[in-house]
Amino acid sequence: MMISRPPPALGGDQFSILILLVLLTSTAPISAATIRVSPDCGKPQQLNRIVGGEDSMDAQWPWIVSILKNGSHHCAGSLLTNRWVVTAAHCFKSNMDKPSLFSVLLGAWKLGSPGPRSQKVGIAWVLPHPRYSWKEGTHADIALVRLEHSIQFSERILPICLPDSSVRLPPKTDCWIAGWGSIQDGVPLPHPQTLQKLKVPIIDSELCKSLYWRGAGQEAITEGMLCAGYLEGERDACLGDSGGPLMCQVDDHWLLTGIISWGEGCAERNRPGVYTSLLAHRSWVQRIVQGVQLRGYLADSGDTGSS
């Protein structure tokens, strides 16, 4: 991946349950199977580019969606429920009131051949964060996308968790990004456009602020953002990755901790990726999206739990 970024200044009776368990644990292909109950968040049913990234495995990240504009991949997003996706607000810019231009492709691994088990759904409307301004482009860079109809969950289409208030991300925590963005500046992901993944460590917020320092009163890194990546560059998100997830694993659940937002160039030295923090914007999402699932680390027991 190198991830898509805007310019920095702009931017369930028992029989039924038994059948479900068989479907979820079978090693045989289940191409026509769907999960008809609300599944646990952040838990892929199957295990295993971005700049310096590598191919992901089919259904490894079943919450990642492609947001299409006029039928072509434009940005990525993350599935929260059967009707809601979250992404970066800058993916829509001045087209917030033109949802018919966009659609969402779910369950795809290779965009060049998404296959019959993928689902394509229109967008009913887009709701950006109230503090987002497309002219400025970086502050509160988060938007909720309402799908035209409910989707069917399957082993390839599952929701991700949001972090609860117990979650902390100390520097050097290893997390992951994934997307279908360019593999270098000006070099699109080649056919068949296989979803790329990349491990990225969390970067200390004060260090990131210093790297992007623009002078007093002009702080580029704010409390609603977090940084991750490599100071030496070479590996990063790039164009077409915007809106995709920064995912951290807590026990056996994957949490959406950030949204790919911006940076300067792709994989440039001392210019790590900047992400919209879901820790900072979780409450806003919860007020709007019914049924979103939270998980986190409970300090007294070390278990996951919802809140």
Swiss-Prot record:
A GO cellular component annotation in the UniProt record: extracellular space
Record: active site: H90, D141, S242
UniProt cross-references to InterPro entries, sorted A to Z: Peptidase_S1_PA, Peptidase_S1_PA_chymotrypsin, Peptidase_S1A, Trypsin_dom, TRYPSIN_HIS, TRYPSIN_SER
Domain of life: Eukaryota
Molecular function GO labels: peptidase activator activity; serine-type endopeptidase activity
Keyword Signal attached: yes
One GO BP: proteolysis
Domain Peptidase S1 positions: 50-290
Disulfide-linked positions: C75-C91, C175-C248, C208-C227, C238-C266
Residues with glycosylation annotation: N70
Keywords, sorted A to Z: Disulfide bond, Glycoprotein, Hydrolase, Protease, Serine protease, Signal
Family from the record: Belongs to the peptidase S1 family.
PANTHER family reported for this sequence: ACROSIN-RELATED (PTHR24252), HYALIN (PTHR24252:SF7)
Protein name in UniProt: Brain-specific serine protease 4
Organism the protein comes from: Mus musculus
Species classification: Eukaryota, Metazoa, Chordata, Craniata, Vertebrata
